[in-house]
Structure formats: C-alpha cells, structure tokens
Amino acid sequence: MSNKPTVSIVLCTYNGEKYVREQLDSILKQSYPIHEIVIQDDNSADGTWDILEEYAIKNPLIRIYRNEGKHGVNPNFLSAIHRAEGDYIAISDQDDVWEVDKIANQMSCIGDKMLCSGHSRPFSTDGSFAYFDGRKRNVNIFRMMFLGLP
C-alpha cells in the first residue's frame, strides 16, 4: 500500500457534453494515483448526464450526483467538495483538459502548503492557444475560491 497522500478530483458539470469526454479522459490518464472523481451535475438539459453515467459504469473511481434543480456554479462546487474524501482536492472545470502529470507535479510541490496551483494554457474551441499581453490582473485567488470569479 502506498504512503502517498490521496487526491480527490472534484468537477461540476452543466450542459457540458461537448467537452466532458475529453476532460474525463485527461483526468483518468493522470500519472499520480487518483483516489476518486466526484462529479456533480447541475441538472444538465443536454447529453452530459448520459456521458457521466457511461463513464461511472466503466470506472469505479467515478461517483456522480445530479441536482434536482439548477443550483449555480458556486453552490454546486461547494456541495461536490463536501462529498470528496481524499487528503487533497483538485478542482476541475468542465472544459479543462489536463496534462498527464498535472497532479503529480502539484503533489511534488505542495509540501505543507495550503494551496498549490499550476500553469494553464487557455485555448479556443478550435484548439488554438490564447495568449495574453503580460499585464498583471487584479485577481485574488481566495476571492475566486470562496466567492466565485471576479
């Protein structure tokens, strides 16, 4: 048995059928062992739930939950986070695609710190990468975590 800390992946979905397969495939390919994947759907009206059920049947690490009504992004994530059982929680948006070593890299850096983040490479729906002009943005990570995006 490994002494590595356990990592729960938490993601929330809402009408994400266009992206959720690629996202889940990238999470399932992580080089660091994943304890569980907790997915909470916010009552999607497209085929998202069917895709989630398909993945949950194939992979026992995946636990899926569906809201009866639409709760919104922050309450949905808060509820999903409370369901997670791992030592650490990694949050994923429904259109994220992770590099295979994302969790391994973060776990090698976190040590006794409370929070660890990684670099991201935003890309458009056609797959081309977006670049920014280097200006500092007024972003408060704790505000984003607890209150939502600015």
Regions found by a protein language model. Give the residues of each.
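Nucleotide-sugar donor-binding/catalytic module of glycosyltransferases
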Residues: 1-150
